[in-house]
A protein has these predicted regions:
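Residue at a conserved register position within TPR or TPR-like alpha-solenoid repeats
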Residues: 116, 120-123, 178, 215, ...
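Short coil/turn segments at helix-helix junctions and helix-capping linkers
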Residues: 96-104, 161-162, 178, 201-208, ...
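TPR repeat positional signature
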Residues: 108-109, 113-116, 171, 210, ...
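Alpha-helix C-terminal capping/termination sites
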Residues: 122-125, 133, 180-183, 224, ...
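Charged, E/D/K/R/S-rich low-complexity terminal regions of large eukaryotic assembly subunits
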Residues: 1-107, 114-117, 128, 141-164, ...
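Amphipathic alpha-helical repeat scaffolds
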Residues: 172-176, 220, 259, 287
Length: 410
């Protein structure tokens, strides 16, 4: 049966009295079926035509209900900018109620903040298409940050009913907004507050989905700052805690975890690449080149995928993977020399020429070998006078992951 506005108000009131957060979230969601039902009751709803409903239920819920109708109306008329403004006002009204209540309100908070972010995305996209400039996502991020403060400052609720149980979900949403508008540095303020807060539950006690989102963005922040050890740690935890059916989220994490593992010499299996064909298209050529020690193939893969790698912020990381490829090439030289401990530099020079570095001089080849020794990819030293590479009798080519701080020296 279609819902009229009086029934809508009654159901909101019932949800409030029962402290039913999930139902309240459902009632405030613009995509819920009753949104279209309510519009049938009003031809062209405006704040003034709906003003007489103020006082119908306790404040601020009378105004929130009116805002909801206005939001649905703007969405139906494909006006995302106006819908975003009304949703922002709805969130502000909700905050007045939220800060005076306990954690049962969190499902509704999460829902209206998600809708705010989605409408901000739609509004910015719509403006861009029409050659206009808007910063709705930036405004959304500021609003979400206010929600974070409202969650953190709950001092009165019992621990199991605290608004603090919303902290990591809200932080994850704020980080999504900041990453979307490329204002990543703003995430550091929130992380600093979390790190300095001793009165919130440990991360592992929060819902797993909250943990995964937070660790993913923490890993991404470390990745972009070239703090590769911490990035690998956080992304690994995010991946192994990610729901097995959340295939897209797993792929999103692996897009950055795989190159970090490659830099340590841990190449992805064929089975993993089969499960994620989009990632296989990006990484398989690099993996094949590293296994073959084929520098030319590695360079071709970089060139062909340059635009995509720049878009994903992966170009610099995979450029560093050349050293893994060079290690593979030099190891093949060592194998061709029957694993000898004394190999002329000329052999490494010849291998580089064959691999596509056609203009390289012997002196440059010597420098490349010296660099591989310095970074721990090879064990030995160079006799410059005799133009000879003297390799260790045992473990001349250690596994990349066995090098001291294998990511720190990249």
């Amino acid at each position: 049966m279609p819902m009229d506005f009086s029934t809508f108000l009654t159901q909101i009131n019932d949800a409030l009295n029962a402290e039913n957060g999930p139902n309240l979230a459902y009632l405030l969601r613009p995509t819920s079926p009753h949104g279209k039902d309510l519009l049938k009751s009003f031809r062209s709803p405006t704040a003034s035509t709906l003003a007489h409903f103020k006082g119908s239920i306790t404040s601020p819920w009378d105004e929130i209900a009116i805002q909801y109708v206005l939001i649905c109306s703007h969405i139906a008329r494909l006006r995302p900018g106006e819908a975003f403004k009304e949703q922002s006002q709805l969130v502000s009204l909700f905050f007045r109620f939220f800060i005076e209540n306990r954690g049962w309100t969190l499902p509704a908070l999460f829902s209206i903040l998600r809708d705010l972010r989605d409408l901000a995305h739609d509004a910015d996209w719509h403006a861009k298409v029409h050659n206009q400039n808007t910063e709705c996502m930036v405004e959304a991020a500021r609003t979400v940050a206010k929600a974070f403060s409202s969650c953190m400052t709950d001092r009165l609720s019992p621990p199991d009913e605290s608004r603090k149980w919303g902290v990591y979900y809200v932080v994850g949403l704020a980080m999504k907004c900041y990453f979307k508008v490329k204002r990543i540095s703003l995430t550091k303020n929130i992380i600093k507050v979390l790190d300095n807060s001793s009165d919130i539950p440990a991360l592992e006690f929060y819902p797993r989905s909250h943990q995964v989102t937070y660790r993913y963005y923490l890993g991404m922040l470390s990745f972009l700052n070239e703090e590769y050890e911490k990035a690998e740690q956080e992304l690994t935890l995010a991946f192994y805690h990610c729901h097995i059916q959340a295939h897209d989220n797993q792929a999103r994490i692996l897009a950055y975890l795989i190159p970090l593992r490659i830099l340590k010499g841990h190449l992805p299996s064929d089975e993993l690449m089969y499960r994620f064909p989009v990632l296989a298209d990006i990484f398989s050529p690099f993996v094949a080149a590293i296994r073959a020690g084929d520098l030319a193939a590695y360079e071709r893969a970089l060139e062909l995928r340059e635009a995509r790698l720049i878009e994903l912020n992966l170009l610099l990381t995979l450029e560093k993977g050349r050293e893994l490829c060079m290690r593979g090439l030099f190891r093949r030289v060592w194998l061709a020399a029957d694993k000898g401990t004394r190999i002329p530099i000329s052999m490494f020079h010849a291998a580089l020429l064959i691999s596509g570095m056609k203009d390289i001089e012997v002196e440059e080849a010597e420098c490349l070998v010296a660099n591989m020794v310095y970074k721990g990819f090879m064990r030995g030293y160079i006799s410059h006078e005799k133009q000879m590479v003297v390799l260790a009798a045992n473990n001349a080519f250690p596994r990349p992951a066995e090098r001291p701080a294998p990511l720190a020296s990249l």
